């Protein structure tokens, strides 16, 4: 069985993500119906409990194991942590990222924490280094075009 894919979007609506996936040939409704695709609003995943997404991922990991799936892939936009600005939110973000294990105990979860480049630029160099897990996480820069918004993703 295929992996379960969780996409937690922040700057785009859930419907926009569905539309974009459909535009590149993904049969979104079939994937949602068979339980292999979940698309959520990241704000609702983090608020009011900042660990909401982690709890969802743990539940999906257990479900994947029960169903004999390969595992779970998680793509999460971290924009929530930049919503109100201030260093306190950056500190909360770094603590959140540090508490995310590179892999789950069963090794069946792979994750991408995605950052809008404008958000990422608000962090100082030491905060950026902490987010990268002192070299334990890989940094991937994604650019649509020279005029489009850029994004960063950390893979664990």
Functional labels for PLM-detected ranges:
Residues 1-156:
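Non-catalytic regulatory/interaction regions at protein termini and inter-domain linkers
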